Amino acid sequence: MEESWGEPGETVEEPTSIEVQDIKLFGKWPLEGLNISDISLTDYIAVKDNHAVYLPHTAARYAVKRFRKAQCPIVERLTNSLMMHGRNNGKKLMAVRIVRHSFEIMHLLTGENPLQLVCEAISNSGPREDSTRIGRAGTVRRQAVDVAPLRRVNQAIWLLCTGAREASFRNIKSIAECLADELINAARGSSNSYAIKKKDELERVAKSNR
């Protein structure tokens, strides 16, 4: 026996409004209201709504085309940079776990959104000026040059992860704790941060080679 699905002339009303759920990183940290202090880096620190993810593991092919990695969510770039040195290659889940634990520690210590601290740390850690080698074989000199915004973001992420990795080596503190300390110190502009010290050193060398 066939079931009747209403009268022939009857129309079914569709729901007019659909609630859009906010996407929060790890189900906790929202991307709304994040402020990037350095206006030149706003296009290269991917924290806008179209870059919102639940986990920093999009598995997209950002290396296929030049400059496409600027579209990668900034927390995923931080996670990928933790997978350095051969023994850590490919251990993405371990890196995601480290970032999640460090975000929890940062929130406990500061009471702020960890994503805002990451944005501030990257803005403060990217060197604005660097020096490059100019000249042919025999006569080589160093010349100060301005650093592109994407290069600043790349270098800041690398310095932050390197500082956390070196601080945790032969240390009772876990790498999640060291990463949280490094990000907080860099966001505050403290000289206790490895990334801030290296950035100041690079800018000092560039200034002497102007």
Curated annotation (Swiss-Prot):
InterPro entries: Ribosomal_uS7, Ribosomal_uS7_CS, Ribosomal_uS7_dom, Ribosomal_uS7_dom_sf, Ribosomal_uS7_euk/arc. GO terms for molecular function: RNA binding; structural constituent of ribosome. It comes from the Eukaryota. Keywords: Ribonucleoprotein, Ribosomal protein. CDD domains: uS7_Eukaryote. The keyword Ribosomal protein applies. GO terms for biological process: translation. One of its GO terms (cellular component) is small ribosomal subunit. The keyword Ribonucleoprotein applies. PANTHER family: RIBOSOMAL PROTEIN S7. Belongs to the universal ribosomal protein uS7 family. This is Small ribosomal subunit protein uS7. The gene is RPS5.
